[in-house]
Amino acid sequence: MAELLSPAGGWDSLVAAVQSGADAVYMGFGAYNARRSAKNFTEEEFAQAVRYCHLRGVRVYLTLNTLLTDRELPGAAELLHKASRLGADAVLIQDWGVWQLARQAAPELPLHASTQMSLHTLGGARRAAELGLTRVCLLYTSDAADEED
């Protein structure tokens, strides 16, 4: 099922996305995301954004979509736990190590493959589903986006 997913790099873009009909927004919270150039959100702002979106029927996805070092994993685990506690609907990931970490730190939180995971075939999307990812953001250049499956 397709959804209109919009970036939210700060409060103004979050409100614009919601008011423009986005089904879901993705945003950075903390240091471990590919949206480092965006304003991103503090923990308190993230909680406010989740409440704002959920009151309007919009889902919130945390971006945890960069490659992490072993030293960064404990901080990422804490971030996953906080995001789950604050009501995030899912996490966009790139790194299969984060997939494993998330299964331990926040097993109830659905995982989505970010475009940074570089899935571009129907076979790759199916394998991600077999491994428990509930949504895949295909590369925009992907022919698999044309598939009916």
Model-found features: residue ranges?
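N-terminal basic/disordered segments at the start of proteins
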Residues: 3-24
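Hydrophobic faces of well-ordered beta-strands that scaffold small-molecule active sites
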Residues: 4-7, 25-27, 60-64, 91-93, ...
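Active-site-proximal loop/turn and secondary-structure-junction residues that shape catalytic pockets
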Residues: 9-12, 31, 64-68, 96-98, ...
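Conserved, mostly hydrophobic/aromatic
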Residues: 17, 95, 128
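Glycine-rich, proline-tolerant flexible connector loops at the mouths of alpha/beta enzymes
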Residues: 26-44, 64-70
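Alpha-helix-loop-beta-strand connector modules within alpha/beta enzyme cores
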Residues: 43-61, 102-108
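Single conserved hydrophobic/aromatic residue that forms the stacking wall/gate
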Residues: 140-149
